[in-house]
Amino acid sequence: MSNPEQYDMGFYQSNYIIDNQEPSCNDSNAYGNVYGYREPQATEQPSSPAPPEMFLPSDYGGQLFQPASNLDYYSQSPSVDTFDEEPPLLEELGINFDHIWQKTLTVLNPMKPADGSIMNETDLTGPILFCVALGATLLMAGKAQFGYVYGMSAIGCLGIHALLNLMSNSGVSYGCVASVLGYCLLPMVLLSSCAVFFSLQGTIGTMSALLIITWCSLSASKIFISALAMEGQQLLVAYPCALLYGLFALLTVF
């Protein structure tokens, strides 16, 4: 009878217990490799051939960063103007040196007929320049009268504006009245320039002031008559203008 210990000669003892064995993915892969069989996983998808549309040429040109807008559209659009078509800056501001020169010549020559279309414009470039020049010449003569010059100019324009609206059939704007009275202030600037070099408090100064007042009032009334079509009323318009320019003459002489 064979001895049972005879069968234990070729074995060694270990702590491995067959009941504690758990299936693992490595073991399944190992057995799969051995037997040439592998179970398909749930995440794997059967590969499908690419659709033939992917190999067709696309209409997209490959211009990634080019804006979608068309420059030809903006260049042909009538709402977009180029710099060549824009008016000059002086024209946009309403400054016309040709008209300023014509108005100045009209004031300097009281006998010259005035152009009503030009004189009816609201141009304040020349009047502001002449008001500043009058104040500067008075300052050079030792008379700081800027406040009086600007104050009497504003009040005088309001009075003449109200008077002309009552006398004329067609109304006149305040800017037009201020423009005409300001341009006709040029002879008064010449009188104040003479006061810088010699005193006007005498017979010569008084006669010069009366001449300048007549000059300014006749020029202003001539322009108003031409612009407002008030024939035969020049003396009625010249009288209030003479009162206004008389105040400026008093500032200049005294």
Curated annotation (Swiss-Prot):
GO BP, sorted A to Z: endoplasmic reticulum to Golgi vesicle-mediated transport; Golgi organization
Keyword Transmembrane among UniProt keywords: yes
Pfam (any one): Yip1
GO cellular component terms attached to this protein's record: cis-Golgi network; endoplasmic reticulum membrane; endoplasmic reticulum-Golgi intermediate compartment
Expression (tissue specificity): Specifically expressed in the heart.
Membrane-related topology note: Multi-pass membrane protein
Entry keywords, A to Z: Endoplasmic reticulum, Golgi apparatus, Membrane, Transmembrane, Transmembrane helix
Compartments where located: Endoplasmic reticulum membrane; Golgi apparatus, cis-Golgi network membrane; Golgi apparatus, trans-Golgi network membrane
Entry-linked InterPro entries: Yip1/4-like, Yip1_dom
Residue intervals on the Lumenal side: 145, 201-209
Family: Belongs to the YIP1 family.
Cytoplasmic domain ranges by topology: 1-123, 167-179, 231-233
Keyword Lipid biosynthesis in annotation: no
Protein name: Protein YIPF7
Transmembrane regions listed in the UniProt entry: 124-144, 146-166, 180-200, 210-230, 234-254
